[in-house]
């Protein structure tokens, strides 16, 4: 099937992974053995509505993935009622919600570490959203690659980014 970036094509990809024997895992779940594990994530930069539609496809196939919501998205407000409803709808289908962090430049001016800013943002947003203990950095700097956090999982830890095959469809590629 030719890549069309449609929901039908996406369903085909998920079915193919299932038929190949992949087990879909959450980033925060313990891994096991040398089995074929797939860590599926969606950085929701633009459309929560499309995220709900993708979550429906995955739920229909019995697959769980992690949806990373972007608190400072110029397109949607994660604290708006409609956005919260969509995020809760995704979580109700069995998917995990993570925080997609776009580090503000102000942390450097305030002499804060990336870890301090990350925990501060996570602690604030988990008051309103059903967050799993996992973060993904928006447009990650070299500083976050390989960085381990004490009580949160970073999707750019080596075990997800360097130690296993990493595939991305960012920028439609």
Language model features: what each stretch is:
Residues 42-45, 101, 139:
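Active-site metal-binding loops of divalent metal-dependent hydrolases
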Residues 23-28, 66, 98-100, 126-138:
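A structural signal for short, well-ordered beta-strand segments and their strand-loop junctions
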Residues 2-89:
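Active-site beta->alpha N-cap acidic-glycine motif
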Residues 20, 90-93, 127-129:
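A structural motif corresponding to the C-terminal end of an alpha-helix
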Residues 7, 19, 64, 97, ...:
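Generic intrinsically disordered, low-complexity segments enriched for polar/acidic and small residues
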Residues 61-63, 90-105:
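Conserved SAM-binding loop
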Residues 75, 103-173:
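Catalytic domains of cell-wall/extracellular-matrix polysaccharide-remodeling enzymes
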């Amino acid at each position: 099937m030719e890549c069309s970036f449609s929901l039908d094509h996406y369903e085909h990809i998920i079915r193919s992974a299932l038929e190949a024997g992949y087990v879909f895992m959450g980033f925060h779940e313990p891994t096991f053995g040398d089995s074929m594990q797939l860590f599926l994530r969606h950085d929701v930069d633009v459309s929560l509505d499309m995220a709900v539609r993708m979550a429906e496809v995955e739920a229909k196939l019995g697959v769980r993935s992690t949806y990373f919501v972007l608190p400072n998205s110029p397109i949607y407000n994660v604290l708006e009622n409609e956005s919260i409803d969509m995020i809760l709808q995704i979580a109700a289908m069995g998917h995990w919600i993570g925080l997609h962090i776009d580090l503000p430049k102000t942390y450097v001016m305030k002499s804060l570490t990336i870890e301090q800013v990350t925990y501060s943002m996570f602690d604030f947003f988990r008051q309103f959203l059903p967050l799993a203990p996992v973060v993904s950095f928006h447009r990650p700097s070299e500083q976050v690659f390989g960085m381990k956090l004490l009580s949160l999982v970073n999707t750019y830890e080596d075990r997800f980014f360097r130690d296993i095959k990493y595939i991305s469809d960012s920028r439609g590629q």
